Amino acid sequence: MARARRTKRASVTDIYRGCKQAGTCPPDVINKVEQTTIADKILKYGGAGVFFGGLGISTGRGTGGATGYVPLGEGPGVRVGGAPTIVRPGVIPELIGPADVIPIDTVTPIDPAAPSIVTITDSSAVDLLPNEIETIAEVHPVPTDNLDIDTPVVTGGRDSSAVLEVADPSPPVRTRVSRTQYHNPSFQIITESTPLAGESALADHVIVFEGTGGQNIGGSRNATIETAQESFEMQSWPSRYSFEIEEGTPPRSSTPVQRAVQSLSSLRRALYNRRLTEQVAVTDPLFLSRPSQLVQFQFDNPAFEEEVTQIFERDLEAVEEPPDRQFLDVIRLGRPTVAETPQAYLRVSRLGRRATIRTRSGAQVGAQVHFYRDLSTIDSDALEMQLLGEHSGDTTIVQGPVESSFVDINIDEPGPLNIGQQESTMADDTDFNSADLLLEDAVEDFSGSQLVFGTSRRSTNSITIPRFETPRDTGFYIQDIQGYNVAYPESRDTTQVILPQPETPTVVIRFGEAGTDYYLHPSLKKKKRKRKYL
């Protein structure tokens, strides 16, 4: 008889998963899985008020935890199997030896013939500290020549109280004058062509400090000028850098770096993963304001804000072409996110999804697309830069060939009318021509000149040409390719001359390059016959 095979019973977890939804689980299965038995409740509520951690229970060591086993009614606990603790001092102890003994020299016996009175100079005292160094202080006398000694002055009479004037014993402050010059490449001195008399701002400023000494010119040093002097408290000039405030580098964003890195780490993986996300750069400006108009044709609703995720629904059978080819088959377009590129540009991004393949069950399969647009930089206004500096005179530039001369002549006066007249003995024989007034006696030489066509409205291009020492006359020609070239149409009426020619022969002979070949006219060729000889 074959033994029946024992079927394995399902575990408590498997039974709980199958019967929980139907509501047919036994109470013991629910209490086992959800930990609601009596023992579990005792551990939950009892563990909230009693802490047995650190006692080493069920560890097998038997050490009694951190404090050890404490017998009832005794002192602190002792660890089982622990080594005694040796108390060591914090300072290294020193050995105590005998006291230092100072050697005393042997007393020399006194000679009987020596005098009983010992002078101080002949003292033979024992030097107990032979290592002392003799110190000699040299005091130099203060020179008394030309010293102004301030002595107290007592003024007053018998009936008045004495007033004691004490001078300030503090010595004069020593000062030093120094001059520092900094080179600033952005500063240029403007020189004037018409200098005027007076103070110029281009000269260096000289600052005289008190306390540097000096000599009095004229008069005696002890004159009454000293009594008329009035002393002011001098203050030092501040440095040029004392008013500058050191400012650190301002932050580029208001969000802390730690929070920004944590929040943008997942977003960067979703946007810039080239294996899973397609990168598409959008150039249409509608991507910033109305991105839905790039996906499908629709009416513009000004009350709708396109700052949220947009979902586009399309018919499965309809084939629609989007306004922009880059947004083909896009069914979802996320909300805009603003980030900074490594080139310090501001980038607006949207994460979209395409529905390229659709199955019969309605499932849509497509790739994720990262649409982004980098905002261009804002160029600063082109302002005309001016030189840093000041000048007291007027800057005058005179260009003789450019300026025009105006002649104001009164034709009623007889003086100017004599220009260009021949000398006449009669005053009434005044005969002149108005063209004589325009004549000029100066003779101009235009040899070696060049004629330049241009207009004064356009700016003149200045080109610096070096000049070398050479005995020959060197001429330079600068071609102006920035002007306007005016091309006028030219028409030439030439009379065609027809020469009379005789009648041309019927035979045309064409000579080749060698002149040995010719071609006969077809009319001169013989006709072919069937019979050559008749």
Swiss-Prot record:
InterPro entries noted in UniProt: Late_L2
Oligomeric and partner information: Interacts with major capsid protein L1. Interacts with E2; this interaction inhibits E2 transcriptional activity but not the DNA replication function E2. Interacts with host GADD45GIP1. Interacts with host HSPA8; this interaction is required for L2 nuclear translocation. Interacts with host importins KPNB2 and KPNB3. Forms a complex with importin alpha2-beta1 heterodimers via interaction with the importin alpha2 adapter. Interacts with host DYNLT1; this interaction is essential for virus intracellular transport during entry.
The encoding gene: L2
GO biological process terms held by the UniProt record: microtubule-dependent intracellular transport of viral material towards nucleus; symbiont entry into host cell; viral penetration into host nucleus
Family stated for the protein in its record: Belongs to the papillomaviridae L2 protein family.
A Pfam family recorded for this sequence: Late_protein_L2
Keyword Membrane: no
Gene Ontology molecular function terms on file: DNA binding; structural molecule activity
Principal subcellular localization: virion
Taxonomic classification: Viruses, Monodnaviria, Shotokuvirae, Cossaviricota, Papovaviricetes
Protein name per the record: Minor capsid protein L2
GO cellular component: host cell; host cell endosome; host cell Golgi apparatus; host cell nucleus; viral capsid
Function: Minor protein of the capsid that localizes along the inner surface of the virion, within the central cavities beneath the L1 pentamers. Plays a role in capsid stabilization through interaction with the major capsid protein L1. Once the virion enters the host cell, L2 escorts the genomic DNA into the nucleus by promoting escape from the endosomal compartments and traffic through the host Golgi network.
Keywords: Capsid protein, Cytoplasmic inwards viral transport, Disulfide bond, DNA-binding, Host endosome, Host Golgi apparatus, Host nucleus, Host-virus interaction, Late protein, Microtubular inwards viral transport, Phosphoprotein, Viral penetration into host nucleus, Virion, Virus entry into host cell
Localization (cell): Virion; Host nucleus; Host early endosome; Host Golgi apparatus
